[in-house]
Amino acid sequence: MTPLIFVTGGVVSSLGKGIAAASLASILEARGLKVTMVKLDPYINVDPGTMSPFQHGEVYVTDDGAETDLDLGHYERFVRTRLSRNNSVTTGRIYQNVICKERRGDYLGATVQVIPHITDEIRRCIDEATASFDVALVEIGGTVGDIESLPFLEAIRQVRIERGAERTMFMHLTLVPYIAAAGELKTKPTQHSVKELRSIGIQPDVLLCRSEQVIPDSERRKIALFTNVSERAVIGCPDIDVLYGMPLELRRQGLDEIVIDQFKLSGTASLADLSEWEDVVDAIKHPLDEVTIAVVGKYVDYQDAYKSVGEALKHGGLRQRTKVNLKWVEAQDLEGSDMGALKDIDGILVPGGFGDRGFEGKVLASRYAREQRVPYFGICYGMQAAVVDYARHVAGLEGANSTENDRQSPHPVIALITEWRTTTGEVERRDEKSDLGGTMRLGLQEQRLKAGTLVRELYGRDVVGERHRHRYEFNNRYRTQLEDAGLVIAAKSMDDTLVEMIELPREMHPWFLACQAHPEFLSTPRDGHPLFIGFVKAARARKAGGKLLREVCV
């Protein structure tokens, strides 16, 4: 059985369980172990696909088309394992599975209850996601004490009883607040959080103590004494300047050794080589250049809605030792034709979104970038905005629009995808009356790049795969008309039915590119992504007056 590390949180939410778990996973991976991660979310939605970005942040998409929590994005940025729908489990999905089994008669007339049926289904999902790995980390969403989390906590308690301490570890992330008026760190919240956890039968093996500053040894000893945790296993997690430095911090405190010792993996695990993370941190701390990118979006008041976009831009910068400053611009604010927010920036990125609010602002941002020759990168809705702008103002298609926003448009250059082929070869069909949840073109889709284009140059190969999440697409009825007006169809689906990327000829614009997919989901700090690296390079060139000041790379 795969050794499991269960990660819980206490005192308050948003302490960074996902980052801490992913950082530990990256160290174990660096020691030669095959690692995976799972997120257990206590909300009743089947998945986050229909949840408001203002409440939940971005919806992260995996290769197999699962719409998941943004924590899976953190996981994939820290470890090289590609995750799937099995790695994201919600209360809604658990209950849906159990109810389907009950309707089929799988329980043979039994009264279906939280224990054992719900907890058994949770355990089954954990086993399914973690089989065949050397180690798996399982994060339980929410905070200990929340009523929604109780079935998950009961399930992992049962796992510990069944597998024992050599195959399970409980890691609890808690807060050690600093009270400025008293000039002291307070350990009482941590003690109470562990007490709450122990009341439901779970004794932590490791405590990760979040704090604003380094926790003195005397306080660590106190925490260990009153929580029944070894002093060695009380790990301080102070605020750090660089998020991607967390693996180095946890390694410095020997957290991976605690895991190796408890699971008796010393014969399997090699010494950790964290040189890649050292390079990443060094590039972030010591940039040689700096650019400012305007992100024109609909949900900029809650930047977690664009978490992967922001991270991918930073990755693109650190691969060339460039600090990327993000200027968040509300798309609606541009609809009065005041482009002041886009002045003195080095590049414009228009990310994805849904609905008509702010769409005209995105179209205007595309037009501004095109006419002012500012590097432009459109993603999903950002590509659709660029197509609408080009159709209206270059191709002369007055009233061009997306049918998502105007079903009576005389020139619907963007329209609902009614049929497409999945990666398994099955044909999917949709119409305007289809459910919203799980009905989009989702997951990794291959596309063929056109020879001689900017995207072909950036990727360096003819066929690439990118993750998608969209319901509307470039209308093929206008393909020839827009190409005749100068628009370049830079990539198409493998069956030639869907337009995947567009760009402008380089004699018309130095760097204008847009894609229907979401390349931000495949960007990592150690590797970056060709499109984001190219975009930041173009922004550097604009800042330098058309010529790069210095070629640098990590």
UniProtKB/Swiss-Prot annotation:
Residues that, per the record, bind Mg(2+): D71, E139
Molecular function GO labels: ATP binding; CTP synthase activity; glutaminase activity; identical protein binding; metal ion binding
EC number assigned by the record: 6.3.4.2
Residues reported to bind UTP: S13, K186, T187, K188, P189, T190, Q191, K222
A matching Pfam family: CTP_synth_N
ATP-binding keyword on record: yes
Positions bound to L-glutamine: G353, Y381, G382, M383, Q384, E404, R471
Sequence segments annotated as region (Amidoligase domain): 1-265
GO CC terms of this entry: cytosol
Residues the entry annotates as binding ATP: S14, L15, G16, K17, G18, I19, D71
GO process terms (BP): 'de novo' CTP biosynthetic process; pyrimidine nucleobase biosynthetic process
Regulation of catalytic or functional activity: Allosterically activated by GTP, when glutamine is the substrate; GTP has no effect on the reaction when ammonia is the substrate. The allosteric effector GTP functions by stabilizing the protein conformation that binds the tetrahedral intermediate(s) formed during glutamine hydrolysis. Inhibited by the product CTP, via allosteric rather than competitive inhibition.
Binding-site residues for CTP, renumbered to this chain: S13, D146, I147, E148, K186, T187, K188, P189, T190, Q191, K222
Residue intervals of the Glutamine amidotransferase type-1 domain: 292-545
Pathway of action: Pyrimidine metabolism; CTP biosynthesis via de novo pathway; CTP from UDP: step 2/2
Cysteines engaged in disulfide bonds, as pairs: none
Family to which the UniProt record says this protein belongs: Belongs to the CTP synthase family.
Physiological role: Catalyzes the ATP-dependent amination of UTP to CTP with either L-glutamine or ammonia as the source of nitrogen. Regulates intracellular CTP levels through interactions with the four ribonucleotide triphosphates.
PANTHER family (alphabetical): CTP SYNTHASE, CTP SYNTHASE-RELATED
Self-association and partners: Homotetramer.
Extra information: CTPSs have evolved a hybrid strategy for distinguishing between UTP and CTP. The overlapping regions of the product feedback inhibitory and substrate sites recognize a common feature in both compounds, the triphosphate moiety. To differentiate isosteric substrate and product pyrimidine rings, an additional pocket far from the expected kinase/ligase catalytic site, specifically recognizes the cytosine and ribose portions of the product inhibitor.
Protein name per Swiss-Prot or TrEMBL: CTP synthase
Gene: pyrG
